[in-house]
Amino acid sequence: MSFTYRPDIDGLRAVAVIPVILFHADVSNFTGGYVGVDIFFVISGYLITSVLMKDISHGNFSLLTFYERRIRRLFPALFTVLIVSTCVASWIMFPSELDNYGKSLFSATLFYSNYHFMFDAGYFTSPAETKPLLHMWSLAVEEQFYILFPVYLFLASRFFKNKVGMATGAILLASLLYSIVIVYTAPADAYYSTPARAW
């Protein structure tokens, strides 16, 4: 499994990161930061799906190899951030804040930050400044995708064969409809949950 360098995709990444930076820099009257996160999700989904489908069609797909490469790519930066954040948090946070930080650290380590912050109401209530690992929610969504989607594609390619596209399309349509319904009744769920983000 390998990626061919795509300058066009790097350009999309640059475009996507700009609204995220502007939003977190608290630029006045700027409200479009969340769009950048969606673009990153689309890029990741496109790249991973392309590579997985190529490997499956060539008969050289390996779950262990896929997971190993994801781990080698993501874990060094992830745990560097977690270690540095924990050192700083232990120095500047109050005990009550450290308790909440410990819970978010645990969820970040096990890749369920999105659900941790979803039940904590995330961006929609407490100030983000008191949640230094809040940004880990998007990585958790990606990791859940990396864990589950290869298994689905492998099984679908064996049992559905030429209908993988139809089966995947049905799942994505269900995800889209789900996100549309809950955005009005449970906005935090629509924002953080993986089923609502899958499409």
Q: What do the PLM-derived regions correspond to, one by one?
A:
Residues M1-W199:
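Membrane-interface helix/loop caps of multi-pass membrane proteins
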